[in-house]
């Protein structure tokens, strides 16, 4: 049986702004992992930015020394660099007081450059580990060719990385098996999982069972799965699995103490873990920033989120082109209609009328007396936005949200109230409903490009309306 090692990457993976753990928590974490007998402790990132005390995003290895005053014999202390984002002018010669090894991750287009960079790190006395970003994004031939170069370079470790949490067991076994077949046995084989499909721990355990029987391996994990988006394999679960099924070596109580203290404090300022949006990202091996952006900008159903991500090609899924996402969002929902006659009819209806746009903010109830007095005095035509607003005589209701439109069947509305909908509304549309083109009302680049109130204002502009009154936009 080969040597089996556990690497904890909590201090680097945490979704905390600027990795600002606080100095005391960093001390607690490193000491606790040492006491738990974790083999490899990742202390954080090395980056070009000036170091801020309390962060685990370091500029120089000297910044890490205060946390490693009592390095434990037999443990390896590491940091990670993202190729191209760390200038080696900041890296001092190795003197044993700080980290022992540096992990270098790289993207597909950097595959021909990374080993030269790694050689410069090793020339300063550090052990080096190398790992792809998104192993699934490489062809087998590319991986084999790179591993042959890795064998010549002889780093401490080479890792397979499931960057987007998209690997099922057969995928993990394929890529780690490929690496196992071609990677020299005197180089550690590693595996780093993300939990988008809730498979990080299962895949890590399967990897351990398959590979540790015949070679030295390392598996990455973080306490309570702490990591960006869906998180990672769980250090405590993997440690318990190794204790139970392979070798009794890790102190689970020490890990639990860290979760109760340091991880609990992190949960007060951030969150991570499985969610449907991250599940969707995992299905398509897509960057989670894509789903985060769509959710940030739009109130969108999960099935529609999936449909939009599916429109991205394999390259686009790995990037986060926000302008492209907005374009695809509109295209996905757009259902073009010939609306020239509808616009002409609306234009004639709105001509020379005072128009009040009535949104469903709290003030429409709180200030009802004043608003109704205004309506009576100005003899306004009232157009409600995305809702049946009770207590008012509505001339029109404008809908651009399918959910809101479907709710109207459960709301009381005067039969004379007319309805305007945009063409993105899904499902059956009632007769005598005016339908206008959704995409014609969109202006790209705006933060709230599909806000119902903004779409209605654009419709009124298209109908030649030069001015409107507005009420109820508070808290909306």
Q: Which residues make up each language-model segment?
A:
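Structural motif
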Residues: 80-84, 107, 358-362, 399-402, ...
């Amino acid at each position: 049986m080969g040597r089996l090692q556990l690497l904890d990457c909590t201090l680097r993976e945490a979704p905390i702004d600027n990795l600002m753990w606080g100095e005391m928590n960093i001390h607690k974490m490193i000491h606790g992992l040492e006491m738990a007998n974790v083999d490899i402790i990742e202390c954080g990132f090395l980056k070009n930015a000036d170091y801020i005390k309390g962060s685990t995003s370091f500029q120089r290895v000297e910044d890490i020394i205060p946390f490693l005053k009592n390095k434990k014999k037999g443990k390896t202390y590491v940091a990670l660099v993202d190729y191209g984002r760390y200038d080696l002018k900041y890296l001092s010669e190795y003197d044993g007081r700080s980290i022992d090894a540096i992990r270098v991750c790289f993207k597909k287009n950097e595959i021909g450059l990374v080993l030269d960079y790694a050689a410069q790190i090793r020339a300063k006395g550090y052990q080096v580990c190398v790992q792809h970003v998104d192993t699934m994004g490489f062809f087998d031939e590319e991986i084999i060719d790179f591993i042959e170069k890795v064998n010549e370079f002889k780093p401490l470790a080479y890792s397979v990385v499931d960057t987007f949490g998209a690997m099922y067991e057969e995928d993990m076994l394929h890529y780690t098996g490929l690496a196992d077949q071609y990677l020299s046995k005197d180089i550690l084989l590693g595996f780093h999982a993300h939990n988008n499909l809730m498979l990080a721990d299962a895949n890590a355990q399967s990897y351990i069972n398959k590979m540790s029987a015949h070679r030295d391996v390392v598996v990455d994990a973080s306490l309570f799965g702490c990591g960006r988006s869906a998180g990672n394999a769980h250090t405590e679960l993997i440690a318990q699995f190794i204790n139970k099924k392979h070798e009794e070596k890790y102190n689970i109580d020490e890990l639990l103490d860290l979760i109760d203290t340091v991880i609990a404090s992190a949960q007060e300022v951030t969150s991570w873990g499985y969610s449907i949006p991250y599940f969707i990202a995992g299905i398509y091996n897509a960057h989670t920033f894509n789903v985060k952006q769509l959710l940030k900008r739009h109130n969108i159903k999960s099935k529609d989120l999936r449909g939009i991500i599916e429109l991205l090609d394999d390259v686009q899924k790995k990037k986060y082109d926000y302008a492209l996402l907005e374009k695809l969002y509109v295209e996905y929902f757009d259902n073009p209609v010939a609306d020239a006659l509808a616009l002409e009819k609306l234009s004639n209806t709105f001509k020379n009328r005072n128009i009040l746009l009535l949104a469903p903010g709290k003030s429409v109830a709180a200030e009802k007396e004043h608003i109704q007095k205004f309506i009576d005095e100005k003899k306004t035509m009232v157009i409600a936005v995305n809702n049946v607003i009770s207590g008012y005589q509505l001339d029109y209701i404008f809908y651009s949200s399918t959910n809101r439109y479907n709710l109207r069947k459960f709301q009381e509305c005067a039969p004379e109230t007319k309805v305007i909908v945009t063409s993105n509304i899904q499902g059956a549309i009632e007769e005598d409903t005016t339908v206008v083109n959704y995409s014609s009302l969109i202006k790209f680049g705006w933060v709230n490009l599909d806000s119902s109130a903004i779409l209605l204002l654009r419709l009124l502009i298209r109908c030649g309306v030069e001015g409107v009154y507005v009420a109820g936009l508070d808290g909306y």
